[in-house]
Amino acid sequence: MSELHSLLTFPVRPISEEHYLGELSRFLKAGIPATYTLEQVAAFERSELREDADEVSDEEEQSNTTPLHILARSLPGNLSDDEEQVVLHMMDMLFEYGAGWNFIDFENKTVGDLILERNGGNRESPLYQRVVEAGVSAELLLRKLNGGDVEFIDENEIDICAEASAEVVPKDALDDSTGKVSSVSDDDATAADPDTYLNTKLKYTEDALITENNKDGVMMDWETDIMKLAADTLVSRKPVGESVVLNIGFGMGIIDTFIQERNPKKHYICEAHPDVLKKMKNDGWYQKPNVVILEGKWQDSLNKLLDEGNVFFDGIYYDTFSEHYEDMLDLYDIVVGLVNPEGVFSFFNGLGADRPLCYDVYKKIVEVDVATYGMNCEYTYVDLKGKLPDWKDVKRSYYNCEYYYHPKISFA
């Protein structure tokens, strides 16, 4: 462990500016990177001892135990308010010198995970929120540097935070300039690329919709309570029987069933997958008098509605598979033209839901993005403790947080 890392274990109490800030500044100004990891220290010490520096464990290759991890893991349980302010200044200094917000350490934890462990899971604590703020700033800056193209999650970070798709997209599936899927392995192509997904056979089970071969979870019935809340949101702006609503992505039809129970005046459903459309026909959705089926990709169907200018919605919901946050940004452009001034937009919020830190970062990023359209995003907190499945019948989990932020977006 280096002197920098040792300092961040807080060997001296109380934690004071005099003892810690000056020393931290001295190390950083001397050129020690704010991202200097324990794994790098270990590799250096091996080389100094003339050991084989190439003999590195898989865990060491994949982990990055940064100074911020040391700080977070060493936080005293009885931190005073004054000490907390000093720690915040130390975090500010580390971020100023380039510390990353979402690296994973040797225990597969982010700095945010460690802080939550130390403070009893309080996501509103100043220390945790400081990491969230750093994540938002870093991701928005990265987008700006990429010329406006969305490529949240940089090298070695893609496995930590998922984007808008339910599944995590591997790093090698992303084009470096645009963040769009360019080439993926056969196993991950379905979850990463909409065109591949639309040509993939689907299977309806008792409690899920999955891809037939890979068993990617497209939709599962644990989402039922979330969909009920979403249906209530869509029809909340008009009296019963007067709402005109749009759902993008039928899936298992959970939200659409709830919408029908609320007797909308008109209920539009946009769906592109042929297997889902076939089930909708078999289940009688095409025969419902107040239902309009928009077959095909929403990018085509909704732009056509926008061009015609005859249909406007009191509520719009978005829940598709294999799409990403860049697709949602494109959708925002359309939503503002199709939703009534008093209407509401919502979506299945799985953005970054692989980890609480990433989920909380994307929560704020959505707020920032919709604000550019003159819209506010309000969230309803939903407790999911004990409600998530065991994921044994699907390829991998697509939601790992024990809580859910239900978004309600409307014009300010």
From Swiss-Prot:
Presence of keyword Transmembrane helix: no
InterPro entries in the cross-refs: Arginine_N-MeTrfase_2, RMT2/GAMT_Mtase, RMT2_dom, SAM-dependent_MTases_sf
This enzyme's EC code(s): 2.1.1.-
Name recorded for this polypeptide: Protein arginine N-methyltransferase 2
Subunit structure: Monomer.
Superkingdom per UniProt: Eukaryota
Positions that bind S-adenosyl-L-methionine: 197, 227, 250-255, 271-273, 298-299, 319
Chief location bin: cytoplasm
This protein's GO CC annotations: cytoplasm; nucleus
Keyword field: Cytoplasm, Methyltransferase, Nucleus, S-adenosyl-L-methionine, Transferase
Name of the encoding gene: RMT2
Gene Ontology molecular function: any one: protein arginine N5-methyltransferase activity
Residue ranges constituting the RMT2 domain according to the UniProt record: 190-412
Enzyme class of the recorded protein, top EC level: transferase
GO biological process assignments: methylation
Subcellular location: Cytoplasm; Nucleus
